[in-house]
Swiss-Prot record:
Organism of origin: Arabidopsis thaliana (Mouse-ear cress)
Listed PANTHER family: 3-KETOACYL-COA SYNTHASE
Name by which UniProt lists this protein: 3-ketoacyl-CoA synthase 19
InterPro entries: 3-ktacl-CoA_syn, ACP_syn_III_C, FAE1_typ3_polyketide_synth, Thiolase-like
EC number(s) recorded for this UniProt protein: 2.3.1.199
Annotated ranges, domain FAE: 24-318
Known catalytic reactions: a very-long-chain acyl-CoA + malonyl-CoA + H(+) = a very-long-chain 3-oxoacyl-CoA + CO2 + CoA
Molecular function as annotated in GO: fatty acid elongase activity
Compartmental location: Membrane
Length: 464
């Protein structure tokens, strides 16, 4: 009898341990987030904003005087944006001062459905729209009813039990926020498939006034977007491009200057637009610092963290100037990260992040080239940078990529991906990647063609 009781107890204990291990293993698998595929939007030839087209758009704004023209053309010439970015249809048609709801819907449909059609075509035979369990769409400045997620669900006839999330007002860093939401959803759903669609409406929000701080958005932002397919299903692991390592979000919106440095508003004449203040760079640096203070200890080797701590301690003892721990000065990020996917928000942002983190020209090249070829495409911009890395055959199995995004709020949302196999898809860069980085070194046509506007002897001229 005692032997039977002992055997029963041993059996129960074994079963208990087995189910504990099974539960832990299952939870660990559910927390996995694999990237199966991503697609970026590339517009048609007639949608390109070259020198001539940009000049015509500027000249149509009758609110501008000579000084405003000078400011705009100087900004365009120094923006780091090339001749082949894409603009919204209503602006190219000369209707930027009278956009319609149809313009906004048409712009969204073109970008969302183009990227999703290509994505489903690539996964045809293994994944269909009816297999999608989670859908997240992030567009900051356009929140219609029915929602954009409903528009996608209707177009692709997705299941009735799909979990959909429509995000607005989150700026250029919204794509990483969407990935964070998906990862958290994966913890409660087994063998799930998720779509993240990231884009922005440019046409209805083109600024037609003369406030210099609000003109900047016209010079930087362009039409673009992306769709990303994610899963936590182990059966897709061998097909996956990358695996999510970690996500960190930082929000410094409690500071008034950080909150208002990038904000939608009307100017004194009632023209709506997006205000970018001189505090933007400082807010970005602060948010990025807060973020990296949490993220870097998760991905850098202990040996490098100990070395850095010792160096900082010695500096303190010798009364050396104290450097911020997360700035990258003295901390070798290459010990745990091989690639740096910086949000292509503007030349100053890219170069500022690169300098503060001690990155090389090679490291920031993908962001600079994405800005030159496609412009600032808001939350979708990171995926053009990633696409450049892949098209250049830079991404090898086992390497890690740090994605850094910043946006209104002010927020810094970063994530790290591990490459699961060598990647070489030419994607949206197929027709231009071989011309880069050389193409970006060609002098901006604005400088040569409109240099006369900087001549002070021409100040008496009236431009209309």
């Amino acid at each position: 009898m005692e032997l039977f009781s002992l055997s029963s107890l041993l059996l129960l204990s074994t079963l208990f341990v087995f189910y504990i291990f099974k539960f832990v293993f299952k939870r660990r698998n559910q927390r996995n987030c694999y990237m199966l595929h991503y697609e970026c939007y590339k517009g048609m030839e007639e949608r390109k904003l070259d020198t001539e087209t940009c000049a015509k758009v500027v000249q149509r704004n009758k609110n501008l005087g000579l000084e405003e023209y000078r400011f705009l053309l100087r900004t365009m010439a120094s923006s780091g944006i090339g001749e082949e970015t894409y603009g919204p249809r209503n602006v190219l048609e000369g209707r930027e001062d009278s956009p319609t709801l149809l313009d906004a819907h048409s712009e969204m449909d073109e970008i969302m459905f183009d990227t999703l059609d290509k994505l489903f075509h690539k996964t045809k035979g293994s994944i269909s729209p009816s297999d999608i369990d989670i859908l997240v769409v992030n567009v900051s400045l356009f929140a219609p009813s029915p929602s954009l997620t409903s528009r996608v669900i209707n177009r692709y006839k997705m299941r009735e039990d799909i979990k959909s999330y429509n995000l607005s007002g989150l700026g250029c860093s919204a794509s990483v926020i969407s990935i964070d939401i998906v990862q958290r959803m994966f913890e409660t759903r087994e063998n799930a498939l998720a779509l993240v669609v990231s884009t922005e409406t440019m046409g209805p929000h083109w600024y037609c006034g003369k406030d210099r701080s609000m003109m900047l958005s016209n010079c930087l932002f362009r039409a673009g977007g992306s769709s990303v397919l994610l899963t936590n299903a182990a059966r897709f692991k061998n097909q996956a491009l990358m695996k999510l390592v970690t996500v960190v979000r930082a929000h410094v919106g409690s500071d008034d200057e950080a909150y208002s440095c990038c904000i939608q508003m009307e100017d004194r004449d009632g023209h709506p637009g997006f205000l970018l203040t001189k505090y933007l760079k400082k807010a970005a640096a602060r948010a990025l610092t807060k973020n990296l203070q949490v993220l870097l200890p998760r991905v850098l080797p202990v040996k490098e963290l100990i070395r850095y701590a010792i160096v900082r301690a010695l500096k303190r003892r010798t009364s050396a100037k104290r450097e911020p721990a997360s700035s990258g000065i003295g901390l070798n990020l290459k010990t745990g990260l091989q690639h740096f996917c910086i949000h292509p928000g503007g030349r100053a942002i890219i170069e500022g992040v690169g300098k503060s983190l001690g990155l090389t020209e090679f490291d920031i090249e993908p962001a600079r080239m994405a800005l030159h070829r496609f412009g600032n495409t808001s939350s979708g911009g990171l995926w053009y940078v990633l696409g450049y890395m892949e098209a250049k055959n830079r991404l090898k199995k086992g390497e890690k990529i740090l994605m850094m995004s910043m946006g209104a709020g002010f927020e810094s949302n970063n994530c790290v991906w591990e490459v699961l196999k060598d990647l070489d898809d030419k994607n949206v860069w197929e027709d231009s990647v071989d011309r880069y980085p050389e193409l970006s070194r060609i002098p901006n046509p604005f400088v040569e063609k409109y240099d006369w506007i900087n001549d002070d002897t021409m100040s008496f001229v009236r431009v209309d």
